[in-house]
């Protein structure tokens, strides 16, 4: 069976994956995800005609999220969701037709490129919107745009019209990141700077990976007083900085590095693993029985924790497995990829803007000469050590803002401070690009200049679709001279790439030395 997928950075050359996904996705799953996408387009068209419903928008968010890279590998789960979408579609408008899924990737090259970019960006935004929705937070414009975007996807547009839609979407995604920031901070408090150990203590433990704070909070509440420790993994690291989460003493530290190392790091580990979102890799038999998935995540053969009608989840099976495994007999001192034994997080916009006067004074005094935002997705492709070397080469009078799992390339390094300000400031998860934007806007206001005139350079790494929606937001805000790597998206046609280079001065990364020289002169 053949397939087509080119949505992630590791897609097979030259044009994408056609037999099996490099991510591990099979052709049947890839085709079912295309079928699901077409069903979502059909549902959106029905909602556009019959009127928006909360349940309908939830289906759109969840379905798009299910198609994000490394979220769901289960044929049964995807098929079940397609059936649910089609049943709801028929309930509200039995006459409406689904989009032909075989047409998803067909057409004139540049149009398909732009249309694909919108679809993939919407998949990324759906993840953010769904996390906010689970905490009871919505934005009316964001909800409406899930319908609009999918409806537009089935229409014919010129290249210019598609570009305009991409810029409109970028602004909508900014609203989406804002509502998720509000959901997280109003529910769990404003993140505070927190040092997180990489040591695993003796006794039973659960490693929580993904992005979902709501799931982690429920697990923490269910493990209170049970002698089971909790460790974050990957993009869950920033959870240590939220006051309402860190008040649980069993939230001990962070396990492992970024997602792509799990097939090595999870082997022979006597603990349970809970996947709340991506990135799950096909688990090895050595630890498959210790894997639990929930929400949109799925992998055949792994236990799945369903959400109950009241919105809660019972994680007792995960807890029981951790107790059964028993954990380590003695403390295990793990390190980051550079040998560090601890990392620091919690420098979201609430914290950084709280010391804005100190930062501004340091810039005016010449103590801080440049800011870099070095972050985004990590991945397995050779060449991602670029980001480690780039940060190592940043001058001592510069500050590195970082976010998402790309930070694991360097977040265990100690590169010093400037006047008490750490030179590496971890702003949080990938959605906390919102924090970086707020800091940039505040600095521009303080110095009475445009964001593009600040001594600030964005050096981004990408892997999956949340990086796509963030990039579109940055472009929609008019931010120029962004460096992106380790390779360019295969869904950018040569003409579309030329437009992005000419209009937005988008730069493919080269070498740390050459790029640093180009940036700083």
What are these regions (language model features)?
Residues 2-12, 17, 25-29, 33, ...:
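Anaerobic metallocofactor- and corrinoid-dependent redox/one-carbon enzyme cores
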Residues 2-190, 195-203, 207, 227, ...:
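Long, compositionally biased, glycine/small-hydrophobic-enriched stretches that function as flexible linkers
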């Amino acid at each position: 069976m053949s397939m087509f997928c080119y949505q992630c950075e590791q897609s097979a050359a030259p044009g994408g994956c056609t037999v099996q996904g490099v991510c591990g996705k099979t052709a049947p799953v890839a085709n079912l995800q295309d079928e699901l996408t077409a069903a979502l387009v059909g549902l959106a068209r029905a909602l556009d005609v019959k009127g928006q419903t909360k349940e309908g928008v939830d289906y759109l968010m969840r379905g798009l999220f299910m198609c994000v890279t490394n979220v769901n590998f289960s044929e049964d789960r995807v098929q079940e969701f397609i059936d649910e979408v089609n049943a709801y579609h028929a309930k509200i408008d039995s006459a409406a037709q689904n989009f032909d899924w075989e047409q998803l990737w067909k057409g004139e090259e540049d149009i398909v490129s732009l249309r694909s970019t919108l679809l993939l960006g919407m998949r990324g935004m759906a993840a953010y919107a769904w996390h906010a929705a689970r905490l009871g937070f919505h934005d009316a414009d964001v909800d409406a745009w899930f319908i609009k975007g999918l409806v537009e996807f089935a229409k014919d547009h010129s290249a210019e019209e598609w570009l305009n839609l991409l810029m409109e979407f970028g602004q909508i995604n900014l609203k989406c990141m804002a509502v998720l920031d509000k959901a997280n901070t109003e529910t769990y408090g404003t993140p505070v700077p927190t040092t997180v150990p990489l040591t695993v203590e003796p006794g039973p433990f659960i490693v929580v990976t993904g992005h979902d704070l709501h799931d982690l909070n429920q697990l923490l509440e269910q493990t209170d007083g049970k002698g089971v420790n909790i460790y974050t993994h990957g993009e869950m690291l920033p959870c240590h900085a939220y006051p309402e989460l860190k008040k649980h003493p069993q939230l001990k530290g962070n396990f492992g590095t970024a997602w792509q190392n799990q097939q090595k790091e999870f082997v022979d580990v006597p603990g349970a693993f809970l996947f709340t979102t991506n990135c799950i890799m096909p688990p090895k038999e050595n630890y498959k029985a210790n894997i639990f998935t929930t929400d949109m995540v799925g992998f055949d053969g792994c236990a799945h924790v369903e959400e109950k009608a009241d919105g809660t989840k019972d994680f007792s099976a995960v807890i029981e497995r951790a107790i059964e495994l028993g954990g380590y007999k003695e403390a295990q001192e793990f390190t980051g990829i550079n040998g560090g034994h601890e990392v620091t997080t919690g420098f979201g916009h609430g914290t950084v803007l709280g010391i804005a006067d100190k930062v501004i004074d340091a810039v005016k005094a010449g103590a801080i000469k440049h800011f870099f935002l070095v972050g985004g997705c990590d991945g397995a492709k050779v060449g991602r050590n670029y980001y480690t070397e780039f940060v190592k080469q940043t001058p001592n009078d510069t500050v590195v803002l970082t976010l998402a799992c790309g930070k694991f390339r360097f977040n265990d390094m100690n590169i010093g401070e400037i006047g008490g300000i750490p030179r590496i400031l971890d702003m949080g998860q990938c959605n906390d690009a919102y924090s970086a934007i707020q800091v940039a806007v505040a600095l521009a206001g303080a110095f009475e200049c445009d964001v593009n005139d600040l001594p600030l350079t964005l050096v981004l790494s990408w892997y999956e679709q949340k990086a796509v929606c963030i990039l579109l937001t940055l472009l929609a805000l008019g931010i120029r001279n962004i460096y992106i790597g380790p390779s360019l998206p295969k869904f950018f046609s040569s003409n579309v790439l030329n437009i992005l280079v000419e209009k937005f001065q988008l730069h493919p990364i080269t070498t740390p030395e050459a790029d640093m020289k180009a940036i700083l002169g």
